[in-house]
Amino acid sequence: MAFRPLHDRILVRRVESEEKTKGGIIIPDTAKEKPQEGEVLAVGPGARGEQGQIQPLDVKVGDRILFGKWSGTEIKIDGEDLLIMKESDVMGIIEARAAEKIAA
């Protein structure tokens, strides 16, 4: 991939959700909502502060994040559907321990 976000933008790949509910019901593609969880693939250098200095971003490449349903702009890079969004669209970073509990 040859894409580098600018300023406070980040590049995100959606993380697909389970195809079955906990009760074993299979969810058809037509009933699925787009996931609001993703993995950060690239980050910009940061936003400029009032004094002109660059404020580094809190998110890093590899972070698993939650974002709003309508956040970001959908793009296609190398045939893969990705999102570009501002860091302010991110609601939070999923910590490793929390992600393990969700998966279990």
Curated annotation (Swiss-Prot):
Main location: cytoplasm
Record key words, sorted: Chaperone, Cytoplasm, Plasmid, Stress response
Sample GO molecular function, one term: ATP binding
A GO CC term assigned to this protein in UniProt: cytoplasm
GO biological process per UniProt: chaperone cofactor-dependent protein refolding
InterPro entries in UniProt: Chaperonin_GroES (IPR020818), Chaperonin_GroES_sf (IPR037124), Chaprnonin_Cpn10_CS (IPR018369), GroES-like_sf (IPR011032)
Subcellular location: Cytoplasm
Triggers of expression: By heat shock.
Family designation: Belongs to the GroES chaperonin family.
The protein's role, per its UniProt record: Together with the chaperonin GroEL, plays an essential role in assisting protein folding. The GroEL-GroES system forms a nano-cage that allows encapsulation of the non-native substrate proteins and provides a physical environment optimized to promote and accelerate protein folding. GroES binds to the apical surface of the GroEL ring, thereby capping the opening of the GroEL channel.
Subunit structure: Heptamer of 7 subunits arranged in a ring. Interacts with the chaperonin GroEL.
Name of the featured protein: Co-chaperonin GroES 5
Annotated gene: groES5
